[in-house]
From Swiss-Prot:
One of its GO terms (cellular component) is cytoplasm. This is Adenylosuccinate synthetase. InterPro entries: Adenylosuccin_syn_GTP-bd, Adenylosuccin_syn_Lys_AS, Adenylosuccinate_synth_dom1, Adenylosuccinate_synth_dom2, Adenylosuccinate_synth_dom3, Adenylosuccinate_synthetase, P-loop_NTPase. Gene3D superfamilies: Adenylosuccinate Synthetase, subunit A, domain 1 (3.40.440.10), Adenylosuccinate Synthetase, subunit A, domain 2 (1.10.300.10), Adenylosuccinate Synthetase, subunit A, domain 3 (3.90.170.10). It is found in: Cytoplasm.
Length: 432
């Protein structure tokens, strides 16, 4: 039995994590975010009602669950307040259900200004960030000049630290990027206005999780973005600024690494990517357009059209290695309904003609990589909303089996629609 279950993206993000976390939290006592910030966009559909969460864990809609934002998350007070208000307006008592680590770095206005100034300066070489200040906030953390939630307990010292760090960043904004300086007094006033709300939710997360472990409570760790966007293991520099892989759970929450029991990789039945960066199986034809349209592939955070392509099992195998995945949840299988044939990328052909079955590491090494495909018959029957494996077409079952063979990991859950009821749980991670 696994008490501590991790749910993370096995591709480039947007795999459908929010729904699965929400589904599995039926049995959980805690749901923990451990990396990223409000650059995530987790969409939940419950009884036909849609909720998009960016920062607050997906367990917040359940009254039996305590949601925790761990130290690995960069926290925007403005984004948190906005999200809390939206939920509280719907009658959800967020403050009774949400806890924060005092070690969360704060994202403030100057981080957003820096993010946007840099993307503008990069021009055609822009990374395609969400423009929310995530990267600059992580930079401040590593440079040991960042302000944290815990700093809000001493308001005078906070004001002094803020003045110092803003002088540094405003100098860069004005003199290097030729952008406008950010107003110190406004940032201070805005942050002080919510300081007491934030500090009232602070808890020792590592201690809480250790006590939960000793009691045998079920805990869900909710990843954001996806494995192939990991700052260390992703397609650098076209990556996010945090560790999206399972290793980030321990460092981003304070749970001891030996206590992770099961890692569930969320795997879309095809591939998508937002922003720039390598994508060997990307489709520019009518099939790519079909996947985008059928899958409604537009970002929950930015509204940007996602790039679409066939499932890349070479890249997915890398995700298996990096995360020691226990099982997959296959999502959006129904998007492939109606295609005469479906393809799986099983290897890459390098520019020198070599065939390889592992991914390059640096983005430059992906140049000229061509996918080698295995083609399988598609299916015309609808898989949308099917709740039993026996109700799936044989061709869809063959596709699922082939993914398991190529990756060496069982598909434990199959999602056939956006609602939490449209799911087949073949093996529950908490029972595995």
């Amino acid at each position: 039995m696994g008490n501590n279950v991790v749910v993370l993206g096995a591709q480039w993000g947007d795999e459908g994590k929010g729904k699965i976390v929400d589904l599995l939290t039926e049995r959980a006592k805690y749901v923990v975010r451990y990396q990223g910030g409000h650059n995530a966009g987790h969409t939940l559909v419950i009884n036909g009602e849609k909720t998009v969460l960016h920062l607050i864990p997906s367990g917040i809609l359940r009254e039996n669950v305590t949601s925790i934002i761990g130290n690995g998350v960069v926290l925007s007070p403005a984004a948190l307040m906005k999200e809390m208000k939206e939920l509280e307006d719907r009658g959800i008592p967020v403050r009774e259900r949400l806890l924060l680590s005092e070690a969360c770095p704060l994202i403030l206005d100057y981080h957003v200004a820096l993010d946007n100034a840099r993307e503008k300066a990069r021009g055609a070489k822009a990374i395609g960030t969400t423009g929310r200040g995530i990267g600059p906030a992580y930079e401040d953390k590593v440079a040991r000049r960042g302000l944290r939630v815990g700093d809000l307990f001493d308001k005078e010292t906070f004001a002094e630290k803020l003045k110092e760090v803003m002088e540094y960043h405003n100098f860069q904004l004005v003199n290097y990027y030729k952008a406008e300086a950010v107003d110190y007094q406004k940032v201070l006033d805005d942050t002080m206005a919510v300081a007491d709300i934030l500090t009232s939710m602070v808890v020792d997360v590592s201690d809480l999780l250790d006590q939960a472990r000793q009691r045998g409570d079920f805990v869900m760790f909710e990843g954001a973005q996806g494995t192939l966007l990991d700052i260390d293991h992703g397609t650098y520099p076209y990556v996010t600024s945090s560790n999206t892989t399972a290793g980030g759970v321990a460092t981003g929450s304070g749970l001891g690494p030996r206590y992770v029991d099961y890692v569930l990789g969320i795997l879309k039945a095809y591939s998508t990517r937002v922003g720039a960066g390598p994508f060997p199986t990307e489709l520019f034809d009518e099939t790519g357009e079909f996947l985008c349209k059928q899958g409604n592939e537009y970002g929950a955070t930015t509204g940007r059209r996602r790039r679409t392509g066939w499932l890349d099992t070479v890249a997915v195998r890398r995700a298996v290695q990096l995360n020691s995945l226990s099982g997959f949840c296959l999502t959006k299988l129904d998007v492939l309904d109606g295609l005469k044939e479906v393809k799986l990328c099983v290897a890459y052909r390098m520019p020198d003609g070599r065939e390889v079955t592992t991914t390059p590491l640096a983005a430059d090494d992906w140049k000229g990589v061509e996918p080698i495909y295995e083609t399988m018959p598609g299916w015309s029957e609808s898989t949308f909303g099917v709740k039993d494996r026996s109700g799936l077409p044989q061709a869809a079952l063959n596709y699922i089996k082939r993914i398991e063979e190529l990756t060496g990991v069982p598909i434990d859950i199959i999602s056939t629609g956006p609602d939490r009821t449209e799911t087949m749980i073949l093996r529950d991670p908490f029972d595995a």
